[in-house]
C-alpha cells in the first residue's frame, strides 16, 4: 500500500514493491514524516514497481519549533526540502519556497487545474519571503535552480544557432528576391520588345515568355509571403533574476512567455511605479494576455498566454516600508492575496559547519532531474504550447473536501467571522489550494512523452489526500498573511518582539537573567530601560518610528506587561533627570527558594 500524496509515477518504491526502508519502516521516529499524514492509500502492482528505479533512503529530519507543515509535502519535494535544510541550515519556509518555485516553473506550462466550477486555472505560484539577508535563500535557490540554469544555457546555445540559421535564410531569400526581380524585369522588356516588333510572328515566343514571367512572379509572391511570416527566433529563456516589471513583460512578449523571476532583492519590484505594475503582475498570475500600447512601436507589445512564477526575498525593513507606503494598495488590488508570504526567523547561532558530515544530494539530484525533464517536455513551437497541456481535476472525494473547505473559509469572512481582515487572501484561498494540489500531484505522478493516455485517471485525477495536504500548507500561509494584515495579530506579534528586546536589554543590565526587582519601594531601576534606547533596538516592523513604537508600548501598558515612566527628577535641586523609561511589570510567586523570593516577570502575553 502506498500513500497517494507521497508517491510518484517516475519511481517511488523499492524493486520488491515496498517503500524505502528508512521512510516506511516500523521504526516510528523515522516513519513519522512519511506516514502520519497519510489520509488514503492506493495499491501499487508488484509488476509496476519492478519497473521503477530504487529510491534513495529518506533523510531523518526533526526541526525544532517548526510551524510549517513540511510533513504534508509529497515525497520528492519534501525530501529535497529536508536536504536543503540539513545541508545549509536554512529555515524550512525558505527551503520550501525554493523547491516549490522550481516545481511551479517546471509545471506551469504543462497543466491546467479544473476546480469543478466551470473554469480552468493556471498553476503558477507567487512566493515572497521576508527575512534577513543572512537567511541563505540564494543558496537554497541555487541548489534547485541548477537544472533550470542548465536548461537556459542549452536553450541559449540553440537560440544562437537558430539566429544564425535565420540570418542565412533571410539573406538567401532576399538574394533570391533580388535575382527574381531582375529576371522579371528582363522578361518584361523582352515581351515588350517582341510585341512592338512583330507580335504575330513572335506569338509563340511571347506566350512562352509570359508563362516564364508568371512563374517568376508566383515565386516572388511566395517569397514575399515567407518574408511577411518570418519571425525572429524566440529565446526559450525561463529564468530571470534582476529585471524591472515592464522589461520583464517585454521579454515575455519577445522571448518565451513562460518564465520565472527568482530574486533575492525584491525591493525594486515592491517599489514599482504603482498600480499599473501590480495590476500587470495580477494578470500574469492569472495567465491573462497583456496588451501594452506605448508611445513608440518599440514600447508596444502583446503577451499571449503567459505563465509567470515568482520567488522573491526582501529584508524586513524594506517590506515594512512597502506596507506603510503601498500595503493597502497592494492588498486592495489583490497583489498580496496572490502571494504566498512567509516571515521566517533566521536560525542565528545554529548554522554550524561540520565537514565530517557528508552533504545530502541524492533526493536533490532526483528532484533536479525531474525539473529538467518537465522543462524539456514543453513544446518548442510557441504556436503549439497550449495543445499539449493536460487538465487535472479532483477526484469525487477530493472535490467534496475542496468545496467543504472553500465554504468554511467563505463563511468565516462574514462581518462577524474570524477572517474579516483576511478577506482578500480568502478570495484566492481555494485557488491557492487547487494550484498547490495540482503541482504536488503532477510533479510526483505526471507522465511525459507517450506515457499517458487521454483516459489515464491516475495521472489526471487528484486524490483527496493531496488536496488535504495542500489545505494544510495554504492554512500556514494564511496564518502568515494574518501576521501582517490582521491588526490584532500584527499588534500581538510586534508586542512580543518589543518584550523580547526588553528582556535582552534587562538581562544585559543585570549581568544575567533578571530574577528579582532591586531597590526601595516602587523604584526598581534594574527592571527598566530608557524608552528611546529600547526603541532603537527594535529594528523590525518599522518600530524605530516613535509613533508606531509608542502605540505598541501603550498597548503593552494597557495589558499590564509594562509601565511607562516619564522623565523624573532623581536628585532634588541637582536638576538631573532620569530619562523616559519602560519598566517590566512583575508578580511575586509568594514563596522563597534558596533564600530568595521568586517573581514572575510579564514577558509573555
Regions found by a protein language model. Name each.
Residues 2-4, 10, 20-605:
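Phosphate-handling catalytic cores of nucleic-acid transaction enzymes
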Residues 13-15:
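Intrinsically disordered, low-complexity terminal segments enriched in Ser/Thr
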